[in-house]
């Protein structure tokens, strides 16, 4: 492997930009001390190198990794979506190991680089799986479904196949508040777009009615004698609760008791 240098690579934050930075590392025959996105970069006393995204260079890295093995490519592709510390540097170090050891690098779990990346990807998959059950949609007046989530990792690309297949004829938006981006599904077209400061439309009477019904159902099916908050937090950690209507006491069934449902 190349020698570690004191240079920091700064890229535009995109996956193509990261792959370009990896290419530059190989071309320069150096392992930069850090590879960071420009929005995460902090001034340093050491030399910095701005890497301009080059689709052709990125594609060469992509094709090279795919030629090694699908597992290697998926580790890099999914690693980019994780919240692991110093993600760009970790992925670059991993790619250098891949070029040295080949596909067998995936079995080198005792190595710190491989271990950290593997654990980060596993955490990403686990979090995205949880969100397939924890996403709660609200319906707006134009019949668009909206939801807000606050994940640690960038889970929207992994959630897209599940929800697009589940609601093929609906229009919906899932807003990732942590990473300021949204998954949009409309007219059977999928997009993941940057989005800052999204606020859900004010809930109408119909929406409030069903929130209260769901809260009432959640409270009713609970078995008081088996109440175990620690067990519940193991399966449904508290950080997911902010966007769950069943955990919001304002959705009390008393608020709609005696209210006639619209259209009923």
Model-derived segments and spans:
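Short coil/turn segments at secondary-structure boundaries
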Residues: 75-79, 177, 226-233
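Short, hydrophobic/amphipathic alpha-helical patches that form generic packing surfaces
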Residues: 17-28, 93-100, 158-165, 211-219
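Internal, well-folded beta-alpha domain core
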Residues: 104-195
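Acidic, Ser/Thr-rich peripheral helices and adjacent loops at domain boundaries
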Residues: 52-60, 189-203
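Charged, alpha-helical interface segments at or near domain boundaries
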Residues: 36-129
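Long, compositionally biased intrinsically disordered terminal regions
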Residues: 171, 182-188, 199-264
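N-terminal ordered "arm"
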Residues: 2-55
């Amino acid at each position: 492997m190349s020698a570690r240098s004191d240079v920091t690579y700064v890229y535009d934050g995109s996956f193509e930009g990261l792959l370009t930075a990896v290419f530059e590392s190989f071309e320069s025959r150096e392992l930069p001390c850090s590879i960071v996105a420009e929005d995460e970069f902090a001034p340093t006393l050491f030399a910095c190198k701005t890497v301009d995204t080059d689709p052709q260079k990125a594609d060469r890295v992509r094709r090279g990794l795919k030629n090694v093995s699908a597992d290697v490519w998926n580790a890099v592709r999914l690693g980019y979506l994780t919240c692991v510390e110093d993600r760009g540097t970790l992925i670059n170090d991993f790619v250098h190991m891949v070029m040295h050891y080949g596909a067998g690098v995936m079995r080198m779990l005792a190595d710190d680089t491989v271990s950290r990346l593997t654990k980060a990807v596993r955490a990403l998959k686990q979090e995205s799986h949880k969100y397939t059950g924890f996403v709660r949609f609200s319906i707006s007046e134009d019949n668009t479904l909206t939801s807000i989530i606050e994940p640690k990792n960038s889970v929207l690309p992994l959630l897209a196949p599940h929800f697009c297949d589940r609601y093929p004829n609906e229009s919906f938006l899932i807003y990732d508040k942590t990473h300021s981006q949204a998954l949009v599904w409309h007219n059977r077209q999928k997009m993941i777009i940057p989005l800052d400061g999204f606020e859900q439309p004010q809930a109408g009477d119909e929406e409030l009615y069903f929130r209260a019904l769901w809260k009432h159902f959640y409270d009713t099916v609970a078995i008081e004698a088996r109440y175990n908050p620690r067990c519940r937090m193991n399966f449904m950690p508290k950080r997911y609760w902010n966007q769950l209507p069943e955990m919001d006491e304002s959705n009390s069934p008393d608020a709609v008791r005696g209210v006639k449902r619209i259209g009923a």
